[in-house]
Amino acid sequence: MSNLNEAKIKELIETAIGMRNYSYAPYSNFKVGAALLAKNGTVYTGCNVENAGYTPCNCAERTAFFKAVSEGVKEFDAICVVGGKEGPLTDFAAPCGVCRQVMMEFCDPDTFEIIVAITPEEYKILTLKELFPMGFGPADLA
């Protein structure tokens, strides 16, 4: 059961879908959009940005997180992630391992929600703990 209302879920999904238009993915043609909801209600967006060197690529989720953190925001409730080959979405796209690790840095794994969607009507919601059950985070270094 989500802590978000249906209208907010749909808003995040539609925003993430729209962010795919800004994706720079000339090598994979796998376009990803993200919409990150901060605890203060602000939505930070991101898209994936590829590079011929591959290593310097950045995922949509990290783009959204880094955008928020660069503006002083470090508390979050949820993120919506959508992705697939150029064109209409046909399947769910989950965050990669690096993005899950970034989420562990800033989010409570028991309450932070990850929405993976195909359309505003077809989506799944998981907690970070469900998606990354043995995640390593700041508490492990305390």
Question: What are the residue ranges of the model-derived segments?
Answer:
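C-terminal binding/interaction regions
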Residues: 2-22, 73-142
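Short, well-ordered amphipathic alpha-helical segments that serve as non-catalytic structural scaffolds
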Residues: 15-18, 60-68
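Short Gly/Pro-enriched turn/cap motifs at secondary-structure boundaries
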Residues: 25-27
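Short beta-strand scaffold segments in enzyme catalytic cores
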Residues: 29-37
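Alpha-helix C-terminal capping segments
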Residues: 37, 67-73
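Compact, glycine-rich, soluble single-domain proteins
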Residues: 48-60
